Amino acid sequence: MVTHSKFPAAGMSRPLDTSLRLKTFSSKSEYQLVVNAVRKLQESGFYWSTVTGGEANLLLSAEPAGTFLIRDSSDQRHFFTLSVKTQSGTKNLRIQCEGGSFSLQSDPRSTQPVPRFDCVLKLVHHYMPAAGAPSFSQPPAEPSSSPSSEVPEQPPAQPLSGNPPRRAYYIYSGGEKIPLVLSRPLSSNVATLQHLCRKTVNGHLDSYEKVTQLPGPIREFLDQYDAPL
């Protein structure tokens, strides 16, 4: 197997710290999965690439709870980390890449299934409140029955009238049980008007059939970034 370095985000002038950002790909398909993930993350506007956990803590320190960003993991076993501001400060959740999908890091003691996705953006979208996170226009990946993570699923809360039930997720850290809330990404750059329009369109395409009715060039443009966030 070949060890590949991480991918620096566009516009990042700081050199890559190869002592911390190397990981072995298990297969060509995993390599392609990560390459596609990096491409979409770079377009998302909230991928902070090589910032460290300490730097992420500083970036999020003045932000309200629920603000989050994606960065490269300092753990050589993982590619990405989700850093989120919680009621108890900034928490860092590793994103696992296994079996052709991404998930939050597993807790071996849990028996709950872990939501798994073929895209990091879909993973993030899954943990965002339904009211503030429009649906993806593409069919979701099949979930896996793997053990749950540091953010285990809980029984669904009683839904409000007209709203579907939604599971609650928690972070277990230092003996604390902290609600996981992803409400707003922390932007690393100014988005182009073209990208903002694409996100808006994605958020209003609530069915795959609507996508297939669009002209080919527009479908291709939307496919390059199929997230509403």
From Swiss-Prot:
One of its GO terms (molecular function) is cytokine receptor binding. InterPro entries: SH2, SH2_dom_sf, SOCS3_SH2, SOCS3_SOCS_box, SOCS_box, SOCS_box-like_dom_sf. Interacts with multiple activated proteins of the tyrosine kinase signaling pathway including IGF1 receptor, insulin receptor and JAK2. Binding to JAK2 is mediated through the KIR and SH2 domains to a phosphorylated tyrosine residue within the JAK2 JH1 domain. Binds specific activated tyrosine residues of the leptin, EPO, IL12, GSCF and gp130 receptors. Interaction with CSNK1E stabilizes SOCS3 protein. Component of the probable ECS(SOSC3) E3 ubiquitin-protein ligase complex which contains CUL5, RNF7/RBX2, Elongin BC complex and SOCS3. Interacts with CUL5, RNF7, ELOB and ELOC. Residues 34-45 are annotated as: Extended SH2 subdomain (ESS). Keywords: Growth regulation, Phosphoprotein, SH2 domain, Signal transduction inhibitor, Ubl conjugation pathway. The ESS and SH2 domains are required for JAK phosphotyrosine binding. Further interaction with the KIR domain is necessary for signal and kinase inhibition. SUPFAM superfamilies: SH2 domain, SOCS box-like. Pathway: Protein modification; protein ubiquitination. SOCS family proteins form part of a classical negative feedback system that regulates cytokine signal transduction. SOCS3 is involved in negative regulation of cytokines that signal through the JAK/STAT pathway. Inhibits cytokine signal transduction by binding to tyrosine kinase receptors including IL6ST/gp130, LIF, erythropoietin, insulin, IL12, GCSF and leptin receptors. Binding to JAK2 inhibits its kinase activity and regulates IL6 signaling. Suppresses fetal liver erythropoiesis. Regulates onset and maintenance of allergic responses mediated by T-helper type 2 cells. Residues 181-228 form the SOCS box domain. Coiled coil: none annotated. Residues 132-168 are annotated as: Disordered. CDD domains: SH2_SOCS3, SOCS_SOCS3. Phosphorylated on tyrosine residues after stimulation by the cytokines, IL-2, EPO or IGF1. The keyword Phosphoprotein applies. Residues 46-142 form the SH2 domain. Gene3D superfamilies: SH2 domain, SOCS box. Residues 22-33 are annotated as: Kinase inhibitory region (KIR). This is Suppressor of cytokine signaling 3. GO terms for biological process: cytokine-mediated signaling pathway; intracellular signal transduction; negative regulation of receptor signaling pathway via JAK-STAT; protein ubiquitination. PROSITE patterns: SH2, SOCS. Residues 133-152 have a biased composition (Low complexity). The keyword Phosphoprotein applies.
